[in-house]
Structures are given as C-alpha cells and as structure tokens.
C-alpha cells in the first residue's frame, strides 16, 4: 500500500484492566488477523505474549500489530496500563499519529488514564474514546463522559449511546446517523442488525444528535452559516468537520460498547478510519542538531524524501533481536545501508518484518508512515535516528525518567553469572527506564527501575526466561543530596615535585538550584585570570563529584556553581590542574553549604470501598502521606496523596488486607523533598554502616 492517506498509526492506552488488550483482540478478529479469540483473564491474548503478561493479566511491553479495515492499513500498538511501565506508553506515543483511549464503564477515569492522557496531550496525539465494559454491574456511560470532562479537562463528543444497561446491554445507537446496532446472543461480533432507534430513546438521541451537529459545524464557518439559516448538513459534511476537530484536539469522538461481549467495536474501527489522522496530516517531526536543538528543518512525510527513521523499541524474542522502527521520510529496503546518526556508524538492513504481536511477516521494503521491525541490528538503541548516509540528520531524542528504586541481585552459582550478564545486556537494551550498575566495592549487581512491580517483573524474566537463579536483596530508595545555603569560597590546587608542577586557583559561588534542574555551571570571569579553555575542565571536575554527596554518598541534585575569579600559572596550569582544583573545591565547600538528604515523593492514587476510607487515610497519614484530594465514585472513593517512596514498600498487600481485597492503587514519581531529621539520620547511619562493612572486606 503506497497511498499514505490510507495509513493509520494508532495506540490503544488506558488504565490497568480497562480492557485495552481485549479491545485489540476484537480489532484483530474483526480485521481477519486472528480466528480464535484469546481472553486476557485466561492468559491467551495475542498481544500479551510474554509469560509474565499472560500470567498477571497485564500488558508490559507495547506489542505492534498490522491489520486492515475498509481498505485502510492500521498499525496498532497495545500499550501497558500499569504506571511502572509508562515508559512503554511514552515511547509508543512518540511514534503514533492517533490513539484510542479506553475507559472502564464502571471504573471511569482511573489513575493511569490521567497519566496516559497527559502524555498524549504532550505528544499532541489525536484520540477517539471507547467507554468499555458497559455490560458490567455499575457501568454508566454518561457518568464516564462527565468524568472525562471534569478529571481530564477534555471535550468528549458523544457519537454512540448504549441500548440497555449492565446485563441488558444489547447494542448502541449511532448518534450521527440515528441508527441502532443490536447484537444477538451468539457473542460473535459480526452478528448484528441495523434498525431504527428504540422508541424510548428517540428524544435522547435527538438531543445528542443536535449537540453533535452544533459542535461539528463550528469547524467550518460556511457550513455553520448554512446551518444557522436552516440548512441540514449531510453526514459526509459532518464527518469532515468531526475529522478536523479531532485532528485539532478540539474534541474527542466518544463511543461505547463491550469488547468482551463483542458489541460496539466496529464503530470504533470506523472512527479510526474516519476521524484519526494519516501520517501526512500530522505535524512533521523536527530535526535537531547534536545538542538536541531544533534546526528548523523537518522530516517531510513522503516516500520520495531521503530516509529518516526512528528506532523506538528494542526487543529480544524467540526469533532473535528485533529493532522496531517508525519511518518518517523516504524508503527502507532490504540490503540497503543506513547511517546511525547517534553513533556515526553505518548498518546494513537485513531481514525486515511486519509484526503481528508475536508472529511476523517477511517484507522487502517499507516507506514513510510504516512501522516495522528489523532483525539483528547490532549497535542501534532506543531513540537512535537511522538515515540516508548521504543526508545525515537527527530526529528529536527520546528522554526517559530516572529510576527511583533499586535492588541488589547475585546469581546463586558461578554458572549463572555469565548467563545473567548476557540477559541483563538484552534487558537494558529493551527498556530504557531499567538501569543496571555494579557496586565497585561489593561487586553486587544493582538493578534500578520505576517501581516494585517493574523490578519484580525483571527478576522474574531473569529467572524464567533466562534460567538465572538469583539471591535478591531488599528494595532500596534512590535518595539524593542537595544544599540549602549559598556560599562564596576559594580553592587552590598547587603541586610542585621537580620539573613542571600543577597550579589552578578558582573563586566560586555555590547556591541551591531550582528543584529538578540538576547541576548547572556558569562563569562570570572577566579578563584572563582563568583562561576560557580551562572552563570545561572546571565544570567536569565539579560535575564528576556530583555523583557522591558528603552526607551519605548519594548523588547531588539541584546545585548551581558560578565561577567568578581565580588565577593561573603560565607554565604549571593545565586542564588537569583545574579539574583537580574543582574536585577539591567540591569536597571543601559542600559541607559548608548546608547539605541535606532528599527523598523521592510518589504521587499515590488509591481506590477504596467507602466503608474503608477512614482506615486508608489513617494509614497514608502514618506513612507520612499528604492527602491531596478525595473523590467519591459509584463503587467507592478515590484518594490522591503524596507519599515518600520509602513508606510504600509492600503497600498493596497491606491495602488488600485493610479493604478485604477490594482496594487498588497506583503510584508514579512526583518530586524530591527533604527528609525529616530522624529519617535523614537513619539514612546517613545506614550509609556509614555499609561503608564500614565494605572496608572490612
């Protein structure tokens, strides 16, 4: 297929358990890609193909599937709903042109829905909404529509209305055409009939139809004038307006149904084709220089342009190493040579495949707009740009969050050590939010991630997929250090031992930076007291020392250092001398600047039945939580709080005990805050103890 207007690159994203994967399964069934439906709760779904996914009933990796609907090519990505795997959602949104936001008809707008919606807004991805599970007890379509308005600040445009409620839910009314779609009891998605609107719904449908028309015609001044003069717009005219409003993020066409019961999914697929943009209708990707600054040029969406593509995911499966690629410009063909603009090296394109979850179809070429996988690429990582060697360029980089939790692991025997090294190398390539370090003193391997579940899954993969038996330590919090006072100081490095010596003197100011800014270095030196060529060495000296603070050896955050004077020696001064001076200055000045331990604070979202609210709030308060909001729902209460990560280990078990198994929660990193003195003293004492134990070894 070469007509780019017939392409749709879409993602399906939502909260855990809203029915994303089941919706994807129904799409595959309807588009003829699978013949037997696999259910998530039975561990059989097509896109949840990792053992851990099938077992836990959650999607961990973004599985890519290609299918067709009404002459259009759909590249569909099913993304995880659990907050520990939001990096998968983020990088999927980076390469998508549109999306389906799935909400649970009874649960409504749940915690992860907000996070994913925020990411999609940041990426300016057009979306349609599917309110799922309307066959469930407590499901209420219009209540969820109101929540979308209130909680997400979005403008849902009601396109279908449910016929019946809960166990009497039989179909939907298309508000645009005023036709009813009613499914029989066979459970087959194709077994439905199109009839007139049920008599008891005529007034409601008329009201929503009028609202739809009035909202749609606002996208076209001429059509709006004609409508105000009494002219009735055609369905095609309205579709054109809805398409424009959807692409501009003015509103979000909103549908209802039950993916599990095979009701209503066809209309969502029609909406993908009718309203979501093709690759040619989204803003072209900006090109950047080596520092990541935009150059003003763009990757134009055309097969005739030079190749510009982004590697957005690395995955090791039973077929070998796969690199998932979105092509923005030009063509990619089997056997061609491409330049990796990040490494400066070229690679030959070997086997190219079109993915269907865990199956693949071999292809020999692909073009702008395509999402594909290449087998066996050697030096490509997530976020790397692949381009025509004659036209080098760099696409906007992908930035991933820093881990907030770590655990120490060690193989139980020597044979596991080599296996673990190979396995971890593959896992780090696959997941940019998963980091691994080796403790130089103890030799322990430290795994770092976004949450307990994230690391649990990684340990599980090491054990079961790669057969590495492990000893696993307790989770550790990623504490940091910062300063609270601004000081002015001076440091001289002087060394004379025969022949040429070393000399470097720096006068500098150290002050607390804005939260989240990391380390900033600047110079206001006038004249030649410290030559400019030594500035990078001074910055490097300070920057290197930020890795280990004076209190407990944790990395230092949010510090600004300003060089304002100094002196040098024409013979003895060098970059090395000034770098050593900066390191000495850090050691000298940090203890004077009011150093402080800071801890990661998590944004916690708890759902609890109403009769357990007091227990849950009391427990969060005991965990040093700050309650931010309480929102009553149909089946319980949602509590939002900021809680230190150190207080949240093992929380899910405690919550289930408190709420008789009915409570749920999610959390994501929010910000760092100073620890209370008692906690800081404990952290410092623990660090001192570790240091002493290492010294004995």
UniProtKB/Swiss-Prot annotation:
The protein, known as: Elongation factor G 2
Any one GO MF annotation of this record: GTPase activity
Binding site for GTP: 14-21, 78-82, 132-135
Function: Catalyzes the GTP-dependent ribosomal translocation step during translation elongation. During this step, the ribosome changes from the pre-translocational (PRE) to the post-translocational (POST) state as the newly formed A-site-bound peptidyl-tRNA and P-site-bound deacylated tRNA move to the P and E sites, respectively. Catalyzes the coordinated movement of the two tRNA molecules, the mRNA and conformational changes in the ribosome.
Organism whose genome encodes this protein: Saccharophagus degradans (strain 2-40 / ATCC 43961 / DSM 17024)
Residue ranges of every copy of the tr-type G domain listed in the record: 5-280
Highest rank taxon of the organism: Bacteria
Subcellular location: Cytoplasm
Biological process per Gene Ontology, one example term: ribosome disassembly
NCBIfam families named in the record: EF-G, PRK12740.1-5, small_GTP
Pfam families (UniProt xref): EFG_C (PF00679), EFG_III (PF14492), EFG_IV (PF03764), GTP_EFTU (PF00009), GTP_EFTU_D2 (PF03144)
Keywords per UniProt: Cytoplasm, Elongation factor, GTP-binding, Nucleotide-binding, Protein biosynthesis
Protein family according to the UniProt entry: Belongs to the TRAFAC class translation factor GTPase superfamily. Classic translation factor GTPase family. EF-G/EF-2 subfamily.
GO CC terms, sorted: cytoplasm
UniProt-listed SUPFAM superfamilies: EF-G C-terminal domain-like, P-loop containing nucleoside triphosphate hydrolases, Ribosomal protein S5 domain 2-like, Translation proteins
């Amino acid at each position: 297929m070469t007509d780019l207007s017939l392409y749709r690159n879409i993602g399906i994203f939502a909260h855990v358990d809203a029915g994303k994967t089941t919706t994807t399964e129904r799409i595959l069934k309807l588009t003829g890609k699978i013949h037997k439906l696999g259910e998530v709760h039975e561990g059989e779904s097509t896109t949840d193909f990792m053992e851990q996914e099938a077992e836990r009933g959650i999607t961990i990796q973004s599985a890519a599937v290609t299918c067709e609907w009404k002459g259009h090519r759909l590249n569909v990505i099913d993304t995880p709903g659990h907050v520990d795997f939001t990096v998968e959602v983020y990088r999927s949104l980076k390469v998508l042109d549109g999306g389906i936001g799935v909400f649970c008809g009874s649960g409504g707008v749940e915690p992860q829905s907000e996070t994913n919606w925020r990411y999609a807004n940041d990426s300016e991805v057009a979306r349609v909404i599917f309110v799922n599970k309307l066959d469930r007890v407590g499901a209420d379509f219009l209540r969820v529509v109101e929540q979308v308005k209130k909680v997400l600040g979005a403008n849902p445009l009601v396109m279908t209305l449910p016929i019946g409620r809960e166990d009497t839910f039989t179909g939907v009314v298309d508000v645009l055409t005023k036709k009813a779609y009613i499914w029989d009891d066979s459970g087959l998605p194709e077994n439905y009939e199109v009839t007139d609107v049920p008599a008891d719904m005529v007034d409601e449908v008329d009201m929503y139809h009028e609202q739809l028309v009035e909202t749609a015609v606002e996208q076209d001044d001429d059509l709006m004038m004609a409508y105000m003069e009494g002219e009735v717009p055609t369905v095609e005219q309205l579709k054109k307006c809805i398409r424009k409003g959807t692409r501009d993020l003015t509103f979000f066409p909103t549908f209802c149904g039950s993916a599990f019961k095979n009701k209503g999914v066809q209309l969502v697929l029609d909406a993908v084709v009718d309203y979501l943009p093709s690759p040619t209708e989204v803003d072209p990707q900006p090109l950047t220089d080596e520092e990541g600054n935009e150059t003003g040029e763009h990757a134009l969406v055309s097969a005739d342009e030079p190749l510009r593509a982004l590697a957005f995911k690395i995955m090791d499966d039973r077929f070998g190493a796969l690199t998932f690629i979105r092509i923005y410009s030009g063509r990619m063909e089997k056997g061609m040579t491409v330049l990796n603009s990040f490494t400066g090296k070229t690679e030959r394109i070997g086997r190219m495949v079109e993915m269907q979850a865990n199956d693949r179809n071999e292809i020999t070429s692909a073009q702008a707009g395509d999402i594909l996988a290449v087998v066996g690429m050697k030096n490509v990582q997530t976020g790397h740009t692949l381009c025509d060697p004659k036209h080098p360029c760099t696409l906007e980089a992908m930035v991933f969050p820093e881990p907030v939790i770590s655990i120490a692991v060690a193989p139980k025997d020597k044979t596991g050590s080599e296996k673990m090294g190979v396995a971890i190398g593959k896992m780090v390539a696959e997941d940019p939010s998963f980091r691994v370090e080796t403790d130089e003193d103890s030799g322990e391997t430290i795994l770092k991630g976004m949450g307990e579940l994230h690391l649990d899954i990684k340990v599980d993969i090491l054990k079961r997929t790669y057969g590495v038996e492990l000893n696993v330590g307790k989770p550790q919090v990623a504490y940091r250090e910062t300063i609270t006072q601004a000081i002015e100081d001076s440091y001289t490095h002087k060394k004379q031992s025969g022949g040429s010596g070393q000399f470097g003197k720096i006068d500098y100011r150290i002050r607390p930076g804005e939260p989240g800014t990391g380390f900033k270095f600047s110079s206001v030196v006038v004249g030649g007291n410290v030559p400019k060529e030594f500035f990078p060495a001074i910055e490097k000296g300070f920057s290197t020392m930020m890795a280990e603070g004076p209190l407990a050896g944790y990395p230092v955050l949010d510090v600004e250092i300003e060089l304002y004077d100094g002196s040098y020696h024409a013979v003895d001064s060098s970059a090395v001398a000034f770098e050593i001076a900066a390191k000495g200055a850090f050691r000298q000045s940090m203890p004077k600047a009011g150093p402080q331990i800071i801890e990661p604070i998590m944004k916690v979202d708890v759902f609890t039945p109403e009769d357990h609210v007091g227990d849950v709030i009391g427990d969060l308060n005991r965990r040093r939580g700050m309650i931010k909001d309480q929102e009553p729902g149909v089946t319980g209460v949602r509590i939002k709080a900021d809680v230190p990560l150190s207080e949240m280990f093992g929380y899910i078990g405690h919550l289930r005990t408190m709420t008789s198994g009915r409570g749920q929660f999610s959390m994501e990193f929010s910000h760092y805050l100073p620890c209370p003195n008692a906690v800081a003293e404990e952290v410092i004492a623990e660090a001192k103890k570790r240091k002493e134990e290492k010294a004995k070894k």
